[in-house]
């Protein structure tokens, strides 16, 4: 037998705990009430009617969770959409894509529900989305039934819709359609999930010789990092709708929306999570053609603007749409879950727009950067780290890069605070001045790549304790 081997005694020791700085204060989330706007009837687009109701999708009794918008014009509206690129596209995204393709880029309106995303819900989810669309269309006056109703949903992923409750409410919705400012505001509330305020904007502008109007609604506070494109094949979660009474052809509307979304909604992020349901729908019904003397009745006499046939008017419309979409997109960031800061990341002097956009998104999605903004900590090394790992087609040259904090309008000294110049850190950064700048609700970080003339802006928010609290109990 082999000799026995003595078993060594095992000595156990307590592992010392690692000291970690703890927050001594929890900042309250700023009030968002000043972002809620109401509008007079004259500013809202002509030829649309809206309605909303409670369909028992949300748990809170009476909470608006189902809404519709319909173009009341004889001719269906031109319709365009930018939709999520997530491979797990929700059923309403699939249905909307098919309706836009079969309708030749025209639609009568849309139906939206909040509280349930109808995403990853299989064959039944698709059937439910189609039933929502078809039921709205069947309830409209006979002259408005020739083309489909688009569908949007937002809420919890993987749960079935209470479809019977939804369908039973649609006749009531259609009967209550009107164009009052209150109904528009209520419609914006029917989009909300974790949002803290309804997001409605409207304005008018000149398009050629005519005054046209545009209104927009969006929602979103978490699961925000959109990457949306046109329906595939060519023709939020973040949800949004933009309705205008301008006359724009479907191809021109899709082209303008692609341009606008890539410079607005695709340039926001709250938490870096792309939703299965992200959708921006744009409708243009041409009802601004001519105002009659009685009330708000219209005669549709505007020729539809095309990209090649009306290049100057198209460019004006595209820029107005971009600016309007940017304002709507920024509302989502300002309502970011638990957010206390609104942060603009501006990357300039890049070799291409795509490079500038990619660098700005890397910074905006960095959890370390976002927590530093919450802590009002001028830790600019986290900015450089995010710049450095950005995958770009053109290589970033470290000794060309400069970084600055840009003071908000409320700070007495408007001079940018330079942190890094041509890859070299500033020798004596004024930490007191940095604290003053970072104490503001609105912040801006400027990154100069020193290697071109292109620029992009991305908007984000900070990460707070409240973000974890909200998302840790989302379904409860």
Curated annotation (Swiss-Prot):
Catalysed reaction equations from the record: N(2)-acetyl-L-ornithine + L-glutamate = N-acetyl-L-glutamate + L-ornithine; L-glutamate + acetyl-CoA = N-acetyl-L-glutamate + CoA + H(+)
Keyword Transferase on entry: yes
Entry's Gene Ontology BP terms: L-arginine biosynthetic process; ornithine biosynthetic process
Gene Ontology cellular component terms for the protein in this record: mitochondrial matrix
Pfam families: ArgJ
Enzyme Commission number, as recorded: 2.3.1.35, 2.3.1.1
Cleavage (site feature) positions: 236-237
Molecular-function annotations in GO: glutamate N-acetyltransferase activity; L-glutamate N-acetyltransferase activity
UniProt pathway annotation: Amino-acid biosynthesis; L-arginine biosynthesis; L-ornithine and N-acetyl-L-glutamate from L-glutamate and N(2)-acetyl-L-ornithine (cyclic): step 1/1; Amino-acid biosynthesis; L-arginine biosynthesis; N(2)-acetyl-L-ornithine from L-glutamate: step 1/4
Binding site for substrate: 193, 219, 237, 337, 471, 476
Feature type site, description Involved in the stabilization of negative charge on the oxyanion by the formation of the oxyanion hole: 154-155
NCBIfam families: ArgJ, PRK05388.1
Subunit annotation: Heterodimer of an alpha and a beta chain.
Function statement: Catalyzes two activities which are involved in the cyclic version of arginine biosynthesis: the synthesis of acetylglutamate from glutamate and acetyl-CoA, and of ornithine by transacetylation between acetylornithine and glutamate.
Protein name stated in the entry: Arginine biosynthesis bifunctional protein ArgJ, mitochondrial
């Amino acid at each position: 037998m082999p000799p026995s081997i003595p078993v060594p005694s095992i000595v156990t020791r307590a592992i010392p705990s690692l000291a970690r700085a703890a927050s001594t204060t929890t900042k309250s989330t700023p009030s968002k009430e000043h972002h809620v706007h109401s509008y007079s009837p004259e500013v809202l687009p002509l030829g649309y009617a809206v309605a909303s109701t409670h369909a028992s999708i949300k748990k809170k009794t009476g909470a608006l969770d189902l809404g519709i918008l319909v173009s009341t014009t004889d001719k269906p509206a031109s319709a365009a959409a930018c939709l999520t690129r997530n491979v797990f596209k929700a059923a309403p995204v699939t249905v909307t894509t098919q309706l836009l393709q079969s309708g030749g880029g025209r639609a009568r309106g849309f139906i939206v529900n909040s509280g349930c995303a109808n995403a990853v819900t299989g064959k039944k989810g698709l059937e439910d989305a189609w039933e929502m669309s078809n039921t709205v269309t069947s309830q409209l006056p006979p002259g408005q039934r020739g083309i489909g109703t688009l569908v949007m949903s937002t809420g919890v992923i993987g749960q079935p819709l209470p479809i019977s409750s939804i369908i039973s409410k649609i006749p009531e919705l259609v009967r209550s359609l009107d164009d009052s400012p209150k109904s528009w505001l209520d419609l914006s509330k029917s989009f909300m999930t974790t949002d803290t305020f309804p997001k409605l904007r409207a304005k008018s502008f000149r398009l050629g010789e005519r005054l046209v109007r545009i209104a927009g609604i969006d929602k979103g506070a978490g699961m925000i990092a959109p990457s949306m494109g046109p329906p595939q094949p060519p023709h939020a979660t973040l949800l949004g709708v933009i309705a205008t009474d301008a006359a724009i052809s479907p191809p021109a509307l899709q082209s303008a929306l692609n341009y606008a979304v890539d410079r607005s909604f695709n340039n926001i992020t709250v938490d870096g999570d792309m939703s299965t349901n992200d959708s921006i729908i744009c409708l243009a019904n041409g009802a601004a053609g001519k105002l009659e003397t009685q009330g708000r009745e219209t005669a549709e006499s505007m020729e539809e603007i095309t990209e090649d046939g009306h290049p100057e008017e198209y460019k004006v419309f595209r820029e107005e749409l971009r600016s309007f979409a940017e304002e709507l997109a920024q509302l989502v960031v300002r309502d970011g879950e638990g957010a206390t800061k609104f942060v603009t990341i501006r990357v300039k002097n890049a070799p291409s727009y795509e490079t500038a956009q990619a660098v700005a998104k890397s910074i905006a999605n960095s959890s370390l950067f976002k927590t530093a903004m919450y802590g009002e900590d001028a830790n600019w090394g986290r900015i450089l780290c995010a710049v450095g790992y950005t995958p770009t087609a053109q290589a970033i040259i470290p000794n060309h890069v400069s970084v600055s904090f840009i003071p908000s309008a409320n700070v007495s000294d408007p001079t940018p605070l330079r942190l890094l110049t041509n890859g070299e850190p500033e020798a004596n950064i004024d930490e007191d001045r940095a604290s003053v700048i970072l104490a503001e609700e609105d912040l801006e970080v400027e990154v100069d790549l020193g290697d071109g003339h292109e620029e992009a802006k991305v908007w984000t928010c900070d990460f707070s304790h409240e973000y974890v609290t909200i998302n840790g109990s989302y379904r409860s």
